[in-house]
Amino acid sequence: MKELELKYGCNPNQKPSRVFMKDGRDLPITVVNGRPGYINLLDAFNGWQLVRELKAATGLPAATSFKHVSPAGAAVGLPLTDIEKKIYWVDDLGELSPLASAYARARGADRMSSFGDFIALSDVCDEDTARLIKREVSDGVVAPGYTGEALELLKSKKNGNYCIIQIDPEYVPAELETKDVFGVTFEQGRNELKIDDELFSNIVTENKELPESAKIDLAIAMITLKYTQSNSVCYVKGGAAIGIGAGQQSRIHCTRLAGDKADKWFLRQSPQVLGLPFKEDIRRADRDNTIDVYISDDYEDVIGEGEWQKYFTEQPKVFTREERKAWLKNNTDVTLGSDAFFPFGDNVERANRSGVKYIAQPGGSIRDDIVIETCNKYGMVMCFTGIRLFHH
């Protein structure tokens, strides 16, 4: 297939729309089911690159959950704890395959943002992963292949219209890439930068103890940032991105946004949230929305009189701000990556409040000394990578 006609571009008024290969080669994808849209394919190609690089860097199956050309989550296939199974709504599925575990983590990091996602998988989609995808609200999936059982499950989604794309894992794009804006063609070399342990060798803080687990998490953070709209900051713990701040104009807003998401991920693991007495017929998306409000200062919107009856069998107790702060102090050894340098120490101060201990950023600010000093104050380990990872 040399070109694929699309229903429309970014918006319904943008017609005609298609994807094709300028060099006349066949497209590196096969549409197995459904009809992908313009933004679906942007998510698919960015997501595929992300999971392919995660697999190469860690040796583990990888998955990402994309929305509007940025990842909402990304993870590798490490086993899930019992608590993680509960907060990702997979505790009823038994033991999951590594690939399914990766997607459960990627989807579960920021379930509000992942609603209606486009999924990318590094490995052949197996039955476990398909069963997990089937019960989530999702636009589509891209993978290098699918088992027969997985295809049968996925094709039953969205009344048979779920978008399933198979990508050629051997496809290598041209070294130069182009795009047109306002009738002007932009050309640049592809960002083929390889992210591995060597990137984290320049440790500039007093604390220089960087365990292997932190190196894996830093690699996940930096690879995730490589395919996230800039400016961006990514918090990672235990093989999964737990907070991604994408597309912000200031670095501190990235750090705050990603930190707030990481905090919500950890608050979901608290006894107060795990013990919420939900009605049995409450849908998964409604549970996610309710939890998101419950752990905020707007909790009265879901537990106030006349409201709690919609969601719960009995009125939950308030999860106070003081209780939330106390719980968040238990979140430790979080890693953080930034796609460009920290211009001020305020980013480190905010990161510290979300349990960050390991940081990777390019360095190069005129205030590097202040940023390093702030890290030293908290005993953090910070690497200067010397590379910027802007993505647009």
Enumerate the predicted regions with their spans:
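Active-site-proximal loop/turn and secondary-structure-junction residues that shape catalytic pockets
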Residues: S70, C125, K237-A240, Q248, ...
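Conserved helix-loop functional segments at active or binding sites
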Residues: E53, Y227, K264-R268, R353, ...
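C-terminal binding/interaction regions
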Residues: A72, D117, L121-S122, R135-I165, ...
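Flexible, glycine/charged-enriched surface loops at secondary-structure junctions
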Residues: A57-S65, I164-I167, S230-K237, L267-F278, ...
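Glycine- and Gly-Pro-enriched alpha-helical subdomains that act as flexible
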Residues: A72-R111, I242-F341
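Active-site loops and adjacent core secondary-structure elements that bind or stabilize anionic groups
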Residues: M1-L199, A214-S232
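Nucleic-acid 5′ end/cap handling module spanning
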Residues: I220, T228, Y235-G238, G245, ...
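Gly-rich Lys/Arg/Thr-decorated short loops/hinges at beta-loop-alpha junctions or inter-strand turns
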Residues: D23-R35, A109-F115, G189-K208, A285-E307, ...
